[in-house]
Amino acid sequence: MKNNCTSLKSSIDEEDELKTDHEIDLEKGLLPEYDSKEEGALPLYSDHARLSNSPNTHRENNPSRSTDNSSPLLIKLLISFTSIILFNAPAVCYLKYKDAFFKNYGAAEWTLFGFWCLVCTLALIFLTYFYETWTKAVKVTVIFLAQCVKACGKGIKHFLKKWENMPMAFSEVFLFNIFGGALRIISRHFFGKRWGLKCSLADHIIFAILSILVFIAETVKPGSIRVNLIRKMGHEAKQQVNEYTAIPLHEMNPESEA
């Protein structure tokens, strides 16, 4: 029976099997010989060998990134303690100035001092535990204040550059107050205390509003309240000088007449 059995495989299938057995992977190279006697030995290109020889994890490849970047506990404690000392420094300086630092303390003073030490200790623990939170808050606050100061500086610089006549406006408001005060003193002398320095609140408010309006008007448009005689006289003098010193065209070009 064995000799009479014919194989179901065709000649084409046998050729394909021979080709696949003898094919060489150009990327992997020749397959090493597999020794079944060695325990645990697997072909290098098998799935189990790939799993066993898998590359290291991301943490093993990059050990520096796995380290904690947070500040050490000692540095946190030192910075928190320094902030508490700076907070208590004004009180200590005041007690030193009054010569009352640990002098003539009674039961109430020592109780208050112990309570304050307890509060400082709890604050130290709190600041150390929430170090990242409050330091970020302080940084944001400092940056915000710096930006506010910078913006205010730019605004003041722009204001002073644009409103160059503010000193004159201040001086005019000052003169206006002196003139108004003199009138009120004179009116008090002639018409009694009702119109003098002891006026009602409404009179003071009206006088303050008038002073503010004078300042704004003189700042926005110089000479709107006062008559700028100096500038006017200077402008007229320049015009007269230009008229007298102007040279006629025929004197400048005598050849044109000829």
From Swiss-Prot:
The chain crosses the membrane at residues 73-95, 110-132, 169-186, 201-223. Its main location: membrane. It is a multi-pass membrane protein. Residues 1-10 have a biased composition (Polar residues). It comes from the Eukaryota. Keywords: Membrane, Transmembrane, Transmembrane helix, Vacuole. One of its GO terms (biological process) is meiotic drive. Residues 1-21, 47-69 are annotated as: Disordered. InterPro entries: WTF (IPR004982). GO terms for cellular component: cytoplasm; vacuolar membrane. Pfam families: WTF (PF03303). It is found in: Spore membrane; Vacuole membrane. Belongs to the WTF family. Acts as a suppressor component of the dual wtf meiotic drive system, and can suppress but not confer meiotic drive by compatible poisons. Wtf meiotic drive systems promote unequal transmission of alleles from the parental zygote to progeny spores by encoding a poison and an antidote from the same locus; the poison is trans-acting and forms toxic aggregates in all spores within an ascus, wherease the antidote is spore-specific and targets aggregates for degradation by the vacuole. Homomer. Interacts with other proteins that exhibit high sequence similarity. This is Meiotic drive suppressor wtf10. It comes from Schizosaccharomyces pombe (strain 972 / ATCC 24843).
